[in-house]
Amino acid sequence: MSGRHRKPTTSNVSVAKIAFTGAVLGGGGIAMAAQATAATDGEWDQVARCESGGNWSINTGNGYLGGLQFTQSTWAAHGGGEFAPSAQLASREQQIAVGERVLATQGRGAWPVCGRGLSNATPREVLPASAAMDAPLDAAAVNGEPAPLAPPPADPAPPVELAANDLPAPLGEPLPAAPADPAPPADLAPPAPADVAPPVELAVNDLPAPLGEPLPAAPADPAPPADLAPPAPADLAPPAPADLAPPAPADLAPPVELAVNDLPAPLGEPLPAAPAELAPPADLAPASADLAPPAPADLAPPAPAELAPPAPADLAPPAAVNEQTAPGDQPATAPGGPVGLATDLELPEPDPQPADAPPPGDVTEAPAETPQVSNIAYTKKLWQAIRAQDVCGNDALDSLAQPYVIG
């Protein structure tokens, strides 16, 4: 057999099968490789979350619009105008389609930070422009769905027609005049006039005073009737004689005169000074310096009756005020006694001492021929004794004011 018709060997058939199988597998691998490098929707969502927080309708006012942050010039240069005037007004799919075109022309450098995970660019089929315009302007997941529009209002009810009696009177038209009273028939008698009550006349006191006018003067006192008796003259009652009251009898007890020390001090005037001790009269010779002071009554020796001064005795208690005698009725004082003192106030004579009683040895006997002058202290003691007995009277005071001389 010639070589052209020779039956192919098994080795050649195996080579051909291997070549065919490799071609089939190689073509499928190439197709699978091209499919694996295309950018997916998840990759674009990752870019949108990185660029705008996943808000596909964002417009921050910085010149970058939409979820992939397109500029207006990039959006218009890559055919975005066929979907919407600007990127934030287009839908997510429309923005991804324009993003595929930008990725094909500029690569991942169009998004320097967020575009590192993108694969190769692949053309996308997008919705028509009319469907894109009907898409919501904002993402429902971020801003929520807008509230539905209110339903259109129902047809208004027809106006109610009021009846003629219910219609309000037109404004501006005068009311009709009241009908005039018909004239009475000529044959009827005129009505009797009604009794008109006379006007009530108020009294003068009941009338109100006119405003702005002075009040009327009070009416004068009416004249008394002629038949009344005239008033009694004022001089009918005789004045009481001045000498009707009899004078007080002269023998009435005079008012009690208080002593100088007992009288209350006058208001506003200084108190009287205490009476100083009276000096002895100038015509009397002073007592000798060697004379001893008078001894007490129980120690003094018997002295001559004409020289020894009477010892002060217990004074009688003063008489009552109604029992005192008037100054004119007082009895005369005893001779040699104080002037002005009553006899009942005279000092009693001292008891006689026995003649044989020897004088005490420590008492010096005054010579009989030398007159004794009473000490001023004796008068003072006498005055104190009188005051102790509540004796009052100007005559007694005057008598005490004069020194008493024994001799």
From Swiss-Prot:
InterPro entries in the record, alphabetically?
Answer: Lysozyme-like_dom_sf, RPF
- The EC number(s) this enzyme carries: 3.-.-.-
Q: How is it used?
A: Might be a good vaccine candidate.
Q: Which phenotype arises from disrupting this gene? A: Not essential, disruption of rpfA alone has no effect on growth or survival in liquid culture, nor in mouse infection models, although cells are clumpy after 2 weeks in stirred culture. Alterations in gene expression are seen. All 5 genes in this family can be deleted without affecting growth in culture, however triple deletion mutants (rpfA-rpfC-rpfB or rpfA-rpfC-rpfD) are not able to resuscitate spontaneously in the presence or absence of O(2), and are attenuated in a mouse infection model.
**Keyword set for this entry?**
Hydrolase, Repeat, Signal, Virulence
Pfam families the UniProt entry points to: Transglycosylas
Signal sequence, renumbered to the chain:
1-33
**Does the record's keyword annotation contain Hydrolase?**
yes
Write down the superkingdom of origin. Answer: Bacteria
Example GO molecular function? hydrolase activity
Recount the UniProt induction comment for this entry.
Answer: Expressed in actively growing cells, activated by CRP.
Question: In its UniProt entry, what is this protein called?
Answer: Resuscitation-promoting factor RpfA
* Region of interest (Disordered), residue spans: 142-253, 271-371
Pro residues: which segments have biased composition? 148-159, 171-193, 211-249, 293-312, 350-361
- Into which family does the record put it? Belongs to the transglycosylase family. Rpf subfamily.
Organism (species): Mycobacterium tuberculosis (strain ATCC 25618 / H37Rv)
Sequence ranges of Low complexity compositional bias: 160-170, 194-210, 274-292
Gene Ontology CC: one annotated term: extracellular region
